[in-house]
Amino acid sequence: MAIILPELPYAYDALEPQFDAETMSLHHDKHHATYVANTNAALEKHPEIGENLEELLADVTKIPEDIRQALINNGGGHLNHALFWELLSPEKQDVTPDVAQAIDDAFGSFDAFKEQFTAAATGRFGSGWAWLVVNKEGQLEITSTANQDTPISEGKKPILALDVWEHAYYLNYRNVRPNYIKAFFEIINWKKVSELYQAAK
């Protein structure tokens, strides 16, 4: 067995105008595919550890040292992107009632949540991700990680993710990351967020 690159659940151009087809094609077929290939190359060196990336990245000390950073970078990159694709929707969706209530409880209002999430995504220096997670106490929390690090390694369960690597937005938004973040909020798959939230609580 090997880690497989998942197909996008929609056409490359399905998220336009927010996310353009060329970016989606490059992002999925080149960047994500490279993470998958490099993950498999690392795992082949240690077949005894298996291929459950979520379990491995939940406690990176259990990953053999010679492939640990490769799996953090590439295994994390695969998991992060596989989740990211599912969190995007060609059809505009309203926030589901359960998630809306949880956001109100945690942040005071949806606008306050959006402001804090945007700040986390904008403030992540260099490459990384912004996240809405369910923490160990079962509470919603906004966080960000560098590079392809995953909140799973901190014992947190991601339910919303935004890739803020420049490869995710530079063709369309150039250096204006805030416009990309604003566009992201227009194409979130809130049904998937709800599904992840219910499973993580």
Curated annotation (Swiss-Prot):
| E.C. code | 1.15.1.1
- Sites binding Mn(2+) sit at 27, 81, 163, 167
Q: Which GO terms describe its cellular component?
A: cytoplasm; extracellular region
Q: According to the lineage, what is the superkingdom? A: Bacteria
Q: Which UniProt keywords apply?
A: Manganese, Metal-binding, Oxidoreductase, Secreted
Q: Which cofactor does it need?
A: Mn(2+)
Q: What class of enzyme is it?
A: oxidoreductase
Subcellular location(s) per record: Secreted
User: What is the catalytic activity of this protein?
Assistant: 2 superoxide + 2 H(+) = H2O2 + O2
Q: How many cofactor units bind, and how? A: Binds 1 Mn(2+) ion per subunit.
List the GO molecular function terms. metal ion binding; superoxide dismutase activity
Describe the task this protein carries out: Destroys superoxide anion radicals which are normally produced within the cells and which are toxic to biological systems.
Which proteins does it associate with, and in what oligomeric form? Answer: Homodimer.
UniProt family annotation = Belongs to the iron/manganese superoxide dismutase family.
The identity of this protein, by name, is: Superoxide dismutase [Mn]
Q: Which organism is it from?
A: Streptococcus pyogenes serotype M18 (strain MGAS8232)
From the UniProt record, report the name of the gene that encodes this protein.
sodA
